[in-house]
Amino acid sequence: DYGGNVGASVDPKIAATWRITEELSLRGSASTTFRGPPQSLLAGKGTALSYVGPTASFKAIDTIGNAGLSSEEAFSTNIGLIYQNESFYASIDYWAFTFEDSFQTEGFNQLLGSYSANGCIVDGAATDSVVCNTIGAHIFPVAARSNLASTERIEVNWLNGTEIKTSGVDFKAEYTFSDVMNGAVSVGLDGTYGLEYKRDAGLDYTGSVVLAPAADLMGKLNYNAGPSFTSKPELKLAAHVSYETDAHYGGLVLRHVGEYDDLGAPARLPNLATIEDHTTFDVNYIYRGFDGLTLSASVVNLTDEDPAEARGDLAYDPFTHNAFGRMMKVGFTYTVMGK
């Protein structure tokens, strides 16, 4: 019980497994969850610099707490198959989530976009209307309400957003070859494929102004979908092969992100309309031959791949890709056993 506007919740969960054969099982679950807003969302103000399109520069974004936030709730379901024997494991699961009143903030670029789309500037003067005055109250200084390029600050509020529905499929398979040169070799694959991420129309703090239309964000960059919505590639997977003995472990991991679209890419830059798929390799080695001492070494992004090019001030998508390039790590762990 969080009290106040947040309230309380009883969140049941039901889960069942049917063992069809010794090796094949069917599983499923359904549950509800409840999350009360943290104190940082209920009061106070946080300020950060972000790129504001109409100004072509970074400006101050003030995020205002909302004492009227209610709880965030979700309903989740899952159904899947598992196959397992002494050497092989495989599973596939369908999952779905429905979120209600999720914690979101108004999109600052969406506010400015809506201000323009509603004709709030005519002949260099701000339009006096309910919608324009509601949106304009976010834009500072006041003079910027008649010239968005002169905007210096934008205020956005925490709010309970509209409904979100998302679903997808998780999959995993691994086969182990035992007794290979006094060790074991494992090969495997696991990943997820997103089917949908449907969001109802995004509204402002008052609930009277549409800032973004309803949309399915799966498979999109979502650069202008608001700060609460990041890129959502449909496919992410990792494949591995490893060899392990009592003293040694060596492994190679392939990481792959499928391509996804940027619906807002400018026509003059058609190469940005699709963010290309991206594949990297990691190599890991562990030595456990010393008493109490473990040595390890890794190379991340072995082939030094650059992130896929994308629209934005970083020229890549930081929510999906990494710009660090090849990285090498070494480490050790020494265990002292007490009596």
Feature-to-residue mapping (PLM):
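Structural signature of outer-membrane beta-barrel domains
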Residues: 1-5, 33-37, 86-88, 95-101, ...
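Surface-exposed extracellular loop regions of Gram-negative outer-membrane beta-barrel proteins
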Residues: 1-17, 23-72, 74, 89-91, 96-146, 244-257, 261, ...
